[in-house]
Amino acid sequence: QWRHVMEQGLPNAGKVHVARNAAAVYDLLSGREVPFEKRDGRIIVPVNFSTNDGRIFLVADRRIASLAVECPRSIKRGSGFPFRVSLRDSDGKTLRMPVPLKIKLATATGRNLFEDYAATDEKGELEKKINIPLNLDAGTATFSIKELASGGKISVIVSLE
């Protein structure tokens, strides 16, 4: 390998050991849950690297079951659009952990009004307000949230008045 540039990298495999228990482990770069095993109060996550890639894992005490969003169903042009997002477990309880989100608001014609990345706070919630342009045509818009841990999505159709 001396004096060779390995642009594509070399295959590599191993195991990540984390000294804690968990109900789920998520790969934030691929947006999915990954398999792991529990042993002696720790979790072991197998990893395979085909090139020079990497992983960012989110270790969760409870599995993400759904997204919940609270927002108005109509937006007055030129005003703010407040919303609140939370992650829920299978019992409907809020997951108190930070999780990255992709937030998007687009008109029915496909015009992006807002697109951003944010994360829930330590309480498992995100509250935000989007400013809506005054010069929009009346119609509908799709407000969508994707959580980047398990890949779950939720969309709400709102009217632009």
Task: State where each predicted segment sits.
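Conserved aromatic beta-strand anchor motif in extracellular beta-sandwich/beta-rich domains
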Residues: D27, I103-T107, I145
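Short, surface-exposed loop/turn segments at beta-strand-coil junctions that are enriched for proline
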Residues: N131-D137
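Short, aromatic- and glycine-rich surface loops/edge beta-strands on solvent-exposed regions
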Residues: G54-V59, D137-A149
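Carbohydrate-binding surfaces of carbohydrate-active enzymes
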Residues: Q1-P82, S86-S90, L95-L101
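Short amphipathic beta-strand segments in non-cytosolic proteins
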Residues: R32, L101-Y117
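Edge beta-strands of extracellular beta-sandwich domains
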Residues: L67-C71, D116, G151-E161
